[in-house]
Regions:
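Surface-exposed, low-complexity loop segments enriched in small/polar and acidic residues
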Residues: 1-220, 279-355, 380-446, 479-494, ...
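Hydrophobic, lipid-facing positions within transmembrane beta-strands of outer-membrane proteins
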Residues: 41-45, 63, 153-159, 220-228, ...
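Short loop/turn motifs that connect adjacent beta-strands in outer-membrane beta-barrel proteins
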Residues: 50-57, 164-177, 231-240, 271, ...
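Transmembrane beta-strands of outer-membrane beta-barrel proteins
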Residues: 57-59, 177-183, 238-244, 260, ...
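Transmembrane beta-strands of outer-membrane beta-barrel pores
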Residues: 61-67, 163, 183-191, 230, ...
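Solvent-exposed loop/turn segments connecting transmembrane beta-strands
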Residues: 216, 249-258, 449
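C-terminal beta-barrel architecture of Gram-negative outer-membrane proteins
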Residues: 297, 459-567, 582
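C-terminal beta-signal and adjacent terminal beta-strands/loops
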Residues: 387, 471-472, 522-538, 565-623
Length: 623
């Protein structure tokens, strides 16, 4: 029965052959662990002063470096496991017929021991009833070591002038034109050095090779900014001013960029200030996005043309749609899905990347009422649009859109192995290197409220709320396909994007000089799995990939933090605290909604506290 469901005959004279893949998780060797250390250093040397009554200068040099050291343990070596599974009876004898090794003669031994290629090999029987022995673990497990360094060097010089003294001002204002202009040199270098086993992808739980990175770039900038009052001390215009700025950057990557801003600020009365601004900004690709070595590793979460063949499951797409993704007629309904929802991608850097550009429109209002001393409120609306966004195309997206549209560019990214699989060998993958693709647009509101007041002999209490209301987070990876990820997470939307998040602090400035206590509440609104959204593209992909309502929503999360600080002699500050005081676990979700990379350990450490309660200490010395 087992053979027949794969189309294999069990007749005595049958010559049918088939492949079987057996997987086993290494539970006996203990959980995989990582010991990660970051060390950062920064040195700034500068000088500033007055040139005359109207002009001043500011110049500085900065050097910063961040070092990474990571050691992963309890990973099985793929190479050693293969040797340990390749076993034969030791039947070696000398010319007289005597055993070459009486101790091992007649016992199971690794072929690599017998032929001398690896004398240290220990046979491994994954089906043994009594588990795995210590000597087997000692041979099979290897440490994986990663070293890295990022370095930044900056030299900046600028002059600032108040041209009011030269009479360059409007008759309607007493403050004249303010100017700032200067030059800057910046150098960014990054190096990542995995050890040999890491580069070879020899760790069984790593999902593929960790490739080295070595690269950098330099930029020479010139910049200028101006600010000028239009009205001052007028009815309903205590002040009205404009500002503008421009920066030209010449990169060693053979491109240049222009960024600029325009702004208007109006203070009708002392208690209220309104502002509006437009900015053109750029983000250049970082060193990893540019120079990361390209290799096959875990990336996507689905293959819509694969299914659980052993259970007779049928695929989600039609034969015609699967053919567009490279499936041969005889492979249709015969491609085994990955039980861990992990598929191969060809990932890495792209030296041909160009900067992404963003246009930001913002409006803000600040309210600091004189009738309520200590109260301050700021609210800002933002509308950001990004073109030529630097992203991975998203393997799941490429597969679905290729199947639906037959787009030649999308379909060319899909490379199946000889059996049609995208995971059973490194010959099957979806190209997912960094590209300048599509558009991203987001809108929302930032809120900042604070209120500080005396509490008599007990000192002073300060309340602060910083919150963001996310109205939309739209992605347009190609014309005609747009989806909004606000309030969603999953295999397409990726990292959870709560529609509301905030941090609220209550700070008690005690009557004992220099001693403060702060209690903080961090909150993240619930998010839905993207497959549950009404968007046709997202819902179809979720249904086709087997996502269900099991983890349709990650519930809201609250974290409480406590921090205390003591300042001595106005220069020494000791700060200690506990983050996630009540050791709240992060929300978990299944593999189908957990893309490799941003989703780690079935949760999202970019948003939620993944390692529980954390205790920290910090010493600051001012001199």
């Amino acid at each position: 029965m087992f053979c027949e469901q794969f189309g294999l005959s069990t007749a005595a004279d049958s010559t049918d052959r088939g492949q079987i893949r057996i997987g086993k998780r290494n539970v006996e060797g203990g959980p995989r662990q990582s010991d990660i250390t970051h060390e950062a250093y920064r040195v700034v040397v500068g000088m500033r002063g007055d040139i005359n009554d109207a002009w001043s200068y500011d110049a500085y040099g900065q050097y910063g470096t961040s070092n990474l050291s990571a050691v992963a343990t309890n990973d099985f070596s793929i190479e050693r496991t293969a040797r340990a599974l390749n076993v034969q009876i030791d039947d070696r004898v000398d010319d007289d017929g005597n055993p070459l090794n009486p101790t091992t003669f007649g016992t199971p031994q690794c072929v690599s021991v017998v032929d001398g290629t690896d004398p240290a090999c220990v046979p491994y029987n994954p089906f043994a009833l009594n588990g795995i022995a210590a000597d087997q673990i000692g041979y099979l497990q290897i440490p994986l070591v990663l070293k890295g360094e990022t370095t930044e060097r900056i030299v900046n010089a600028s002059v600032t002038g108040d041209l009011t003294n030269y009479g360059i001002k409007l008759p309607s204002a007493s403050t004249g034109l303010m100017l700032n202009f200067g030059v800057e040199y910046r150098e960014e270098l990054s190096e990542l050095l995995p050890d040999g086993p890491s580069q070879a992808g020899d760790g069984a739980g790593t999902g593929g090779p960790t490739t080295p990175v070595n690269g950098g770039y330099r930029t020479n900038d010139i910049f200028a900014a101006a600010r000028m009052a239009l009205l001052e001390d007028k009815p309903f215009a205590q002040s009205l001013s404009w500002e503008a700025g421009y920066r030209y950057s010449d990169y060693s990557l053979d491109f240049t960029t222009d960024t600029y801003k325009l702004g208007l600020e109006w203070t009708p009365i002392e208690d209220i200030r309104a502002r509006a601004s437009y900015q053109r900004s750029v983000r250049v690709p970082n060193v990893t996005e540019l120079f990361g070595v390209q290799a096959v590793g875990l990336d996507g979460t689905i293959d819509l043309c694969a299914s659980d063949v052993s259970d007779g499951e049928t695929v989600a797409l039609t034969p015609e749609e699967c053919a567009r993704t490279g499936v041969l007629p005889e492979q249709y309904n015969n491609i085994q899905s990955n039980p861990a929802a992990q598929y191969n991608g060809f990932v890495g850097g792209n030296p041909d990347l160009q900067p992404e550009t963003a246009d930001t429109l913002s409006f803000g209002l600040a309210f600091q009422p004189s009738f309520a001393p200590g109260l301050r409120l700021q609210i800002d609306y933002f509308d950001i649009s990004i073109d030529d966004a630097i992203q991975n195309p998203n393997a799941d997206f490429s597969l679905l859109l290729c199947a639906q549209t037959g787009d030649p560019l999308l379909c060319s990214r899909i490379q199946r192995d000889g059996d049609g699989s995208l995971w059973q060998s490194n010959d099957g993958f979806i190209v997912d290197t960094f590209q300048n693709i599509g558009e991203i647009a987001t809108k929302g509101i930032d809120l900042d409220v604070s209120y500080a007041f005396d509490i008599g002999a007990a000192g002073r209490l300060g309340l602060d709320l910083v919150a963001t209301r996310l109205e939309s987070l739209e992605f347009t990876p190609q014309p005609g396909v747009t989806y909004d990820c606000a309030g969603l997470y999953g295999s397409i939307c990726g990292v959870p994007a709560p529609e509301w998040r905030h941090k609220m602090d209550a700070t008690w400035r005690t009557p004992w000089s220099g001693i403060d206590l702060t209690l903080s509440w961090r909150y993240f609104d619930a998010v839905k799995q993207d497959s549950q959204d009404a968007n046709e593209f997202l819902s179809f992909l979720g249904t086709a990939s087997g996502q269900d309502a099991t983890d349709a929503e990650l519930g809201s999360r609250s974290y409480i933090d406590l921090t205390g600080s003591v300042t001595l002699a106005d220069k020494y500050t000791l700060r200690v605290g506990v983050n996630n005081l009540f050791d709240k676990d992060p929300p978990l979700n299944g593999a189908n909604a957990c893309p490799s990379g941003p989703c780690n350990g079935n949760t999202w450490p970019q948003v939620y506290d993944a390692i529980g309660r954390q205790i920290f200490g910090l010493v600051t010395i001012d001199f």
